[in-house]
Structures are given as C-alpha cells and as structure tokens.
C-alpha cells in the first residue's frame, strides 16, 4: 500500500465509521420519535432544521479555517494552527449566541415560520428551548473535531462522537418511553438526552485541548487576545465559506419551508427521506475530509504537481464510492421505512423519493468533494460561494417554490426539482477544477 492510500485510509476510515454509527443511531432516534406519531416527527424535524442552519454555518467556520490548518499542517506549524483555531472560535461563539437567543426566547415564532399547525408548534416549543443550550456546546466541539481530523488525528473525534452518540441513544430510549425509574417525557425526553450527550462531548474536548498529550493545545488566555492582521488574512478566505454555508443551509431550510407549507405529510416525508438519504453520504465526510487534508497540506508544502495528482485521484474515488452508496440507499430503503409508524401513502412516497436521491448521489458527492475538498483547499472560496449560492437561490429554490406552492405538484416532482441545481454546479465546478486556478499556497501570501 502506497503512502497516499495509507493517508487516505487513516483519515477516511475513522470518519466513515463515525458516520455509519452516527447515521445508524440517528435513525434509531428518529424511529423512537416516529413511534410517537407523525406530529412529533414534524415538530422535531422543524427544530432540527433550524439547528441545521447553525451546524452548516459552524461547518463553514471549520471548513474556512481548515484551509489554513491544512496548509500549516503541511509545514508542521503548530503555533499558527492553534492561533487559527482560537480566532475562528471567536466567530463561532458569536454566531452560537445569536442562535441560542432565537431558540430559547422565540421558539414559537421560529416554528411558526415553517408550520401553521398549532399542534406541531406546541410540541416543538419545549424541545426547542432545551436544545437551545446545545448551540453553546456543539460549536466548540465541531471546530476542535475538524481541527483534529485536519492534523490527521481522525480517530480521536471518532471515539468522542461514539461516546456522545451512544449516550444520546440510551438517553432517548430511557426518557422518551419512560423505562424503569425514568419518567416518560416523549419529545422533551429526546431534547434532554441530546443536551446531555452534547455536554459530555464538550467536556471531553475541553479535556483534550488542555492536555499536553494531544497535538492541539488551546490557551484560555490566548482566547481573549486578538491579532487583527492574522484575523483579516484568515477571514479573507474563511468568510466566503461561512457565508456560503449559511446561505446554503438557509436554502435547504427554504426547501423544508416549502414542504411544510404544502402539508404536514410532506414535511414528514422530507424528514424520513433525509434520514435515510444520510446513509448514502457516509463515505462523503471521509473522502472530503481526506481531500482537504492531503491536497491542502501538499499546497502548503508547495508540492503543486502532487496536489493536482491527488485531487484527480479523489474525484475518481468519489465516483466509485457515491455509486455504491446510492445503490445501497435504494436497495435498503424499504427495510428502513418499514420501521416507521406511518401510513401507506407516506411509506410509498418516501420509497419513490429515495430512488430519486439515490440516483443523484454520484453527482451530489462529486460536487461536494470538488467544491469543499479541492477548490476551497487552494483558496477558491469566493468562486465556490458564487457557484453554490447562484445554483441554489436562482435555480433550486425558485423551482421548488413554484412547483410546490404555486402549481401544487406532487411531493415527488418537487423533490426532483431539488436535484436540478446539481447539474449546473457540476458543469461550472469541473470547469474551474480543470483550469487549475485553485493550485496556490495561502500561508506565504
């Protein structure tokens, strides 16, 4: 096995294992809530959709800073790696506080944006208030996990995630259904379990970054210092990624808004379909993270030919992995949907939707690895932002809104419209990749 393969596997396998278990446990959690009926599914799904905006925005912070972490990792500059993390955490926590305020103080208004069903809103309010506290925990955990993966310590976040996910699943089982001495709390129990699992994850990461045994060590004192020159350089490339992920997540939330306004049934279909579809993306996280680390570190070392060679290999690997994943999602979707307590119409609609999204997996994953893993690694963050925002907001969102709300077409037709933007992205994205404009060193600018 050559050095490239060893590096890919050392990064991709732990992340893939983490994603497999995460998707599996999230499915179990979803099924537990699903056994309470379609209204709790809709309520939890809508709150989680708002949390999704924060998650993707935090991913934007992590991904934007990861461009520099990867290139600094190439030359083993740990001081600047830690400096990058400490500065991006300031941005992340500012955003987290804003999301906390909305979820805790204005849950009814937030849910009312998506749904007019009073029962859905009523069920979702206590869930939103409890999970609001996780915003202050997960942002830190997310940044540290991403940084550890970027310095090729992917096993650490895998183990931490397994502890947190296991904690969450057991907590859900005990508190949703009231097992043994625990009270039966339903959706509120799910929220408490989520909060406790995120707290456990946060505390583990705090221990890791304050311990001398691990490669990334953060200082509380340095967290309150600010290097304006360094920050400007970081945000020059990171800010387009943050804006990109925020607007992309807002676009995905707009899709959910359209489905919710179509009917409660439509939002239940979207929630279940998304949970199943996530199984298809179990390889994506590993491949895209490995792409960022390996291509980015070679750019940091100014090994441009090697970076280009590795980028091409990652695209080839993505096509193979995505084809297998898409087929697997289609084949096993019937087994998964049978675990849900839903009627025949929802069941059949979800199965049709899964065929659509499964067939689209190769093109979606290819776009993801190219944009997130390759173009951003070389600082092409403004182009990536333009490509994603234009394709989503000028193609995807208008199509979904018109077909779903104006013409009131079937759910499956509206779902097809969510895929159309990917065609536009792959044409322009691959053209940019072939131009080689992404091949540049950022840390020595």
Regions of interest found by a model, annotated:
Residues 41-105, 138-157, 256, 267-333, ...:
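Small-residue-rich hydrophobic transmembrane alpha-helices
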Residues 20, 24-42, 111-118, 174-185, ...:
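Helix-terminus/linker motif at the lipid-water interface of multi-pass membrane proteins
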Residues 62, 131-150, 157-168, 190-205, ...:
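Short runs within selected transmembrane alpha-helices of multi-pass transporters and secretion channels
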Residues 103, 146, 172, 176, ...:
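Structural signal for membrane-spanning alpha-helices in multi-pass inner-membrane proteins
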Residues 3-31, 35-36, 52-64, 68, ...:
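N-terminal transmembrane alpha-helices
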Residues 10-29, 130, 164, 197-201, ...:
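Transmembrane helical elements of multi-pass membrane transporters/channels
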Residues 1-15, 69-136, 182-239, 295-360, ...:
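Short alpha-helical transmembrane segments in multi-pass integral membrane proteins
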Residues 17, 21, 25, 54, ...:
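Residue-level hotspots within pore-lining transmembrane alpha-helices
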């Amino acid at each position: 096995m050559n050095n490239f393969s060893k590096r890919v596997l050392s990064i991709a396998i732990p992340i893939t294992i983490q994603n497999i278990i995460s998707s599996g446990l999230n499915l179990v959690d979803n099924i537990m809530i699903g056994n309470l009926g379609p209204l709790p599914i809709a309520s939890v799904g809508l709150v989680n959709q708002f949390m999704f905006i924060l998650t993707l925005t935090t991913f934007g912070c992590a991904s934007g800073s990861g461009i520099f972490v990867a290139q600094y990792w190439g030359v083993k500059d740990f001081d600047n790696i830690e400096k990058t993390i400490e500065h991006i955490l300031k941005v992340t926590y500012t955003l987290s506080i804003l999301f906390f305020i909305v979820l805790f103080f204005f849950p009814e208004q937030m849910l009312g944006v998506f749904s007019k069903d009073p029962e859905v809103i009523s069920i979702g309010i206590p869930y939103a208030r409890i999970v609001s506290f996780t915003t202050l925990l997960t942002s830190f955990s997310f940044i540290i996990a991403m940084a550890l993966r970027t310095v090729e310590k992917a096993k650490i976040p895998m183990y931490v995630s397994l502890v947190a996910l296991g904690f969450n699943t057991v907590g859900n089982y005990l508190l949703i259904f009231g097992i043994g001495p625990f009270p039966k709390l339903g959706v509120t129990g799910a929220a408490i379990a989520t909060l406790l699992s995120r707290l456990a994850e946060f505390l583990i990461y705090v221990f890791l970054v304050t311990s001398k045994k691990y490669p990334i060590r953060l200082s509380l004192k340095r967290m309150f210092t600010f290097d304006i020159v360094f920050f400007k350089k970081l945000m020059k490339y990171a800010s387009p990624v943050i804006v990109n992920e925020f607007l992309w997540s807002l676009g995905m939330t707009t899709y959910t808004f359209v489905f919710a306004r179509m009917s409660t049934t439509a939002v239940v279909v979207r929630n279940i379909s998304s949970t199943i579809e996530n199984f298809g993306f179990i390889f994506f996280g590993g491949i895209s993270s490995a792409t960022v680390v390996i291509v980015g570190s070679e750019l940091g070392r100014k090994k441009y030919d090697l970076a280009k060679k590795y980028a091409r290999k990652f695209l080839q690997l993505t096509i193979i992995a995505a084809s297998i994943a898409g087929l697997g999602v289609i084949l096993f979707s019937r087994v998964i949907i049978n675990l849900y307590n839903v009627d025949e119409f929802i069941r059949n609609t979800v199965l049709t939707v899964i065929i659509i999204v499964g067939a689209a997996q190769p093109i979606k994953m290819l776009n993801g690895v190219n944009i997130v893993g390759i173009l951003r690694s070389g600082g092409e963050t403004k182009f990536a932002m333009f490509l994603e925002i234009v394709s989503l907001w000028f193609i995807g969102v208008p199509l979904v809104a018109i077909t779903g709300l104006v013409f009131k077409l079937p759910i499956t037709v509206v779902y097809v419209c969510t895929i159309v933007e990917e065609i536009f992205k792959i044409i322009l994205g691959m053209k940019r990749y072939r131009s080689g404009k992404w091949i540049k060193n950022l840390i020595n600018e």
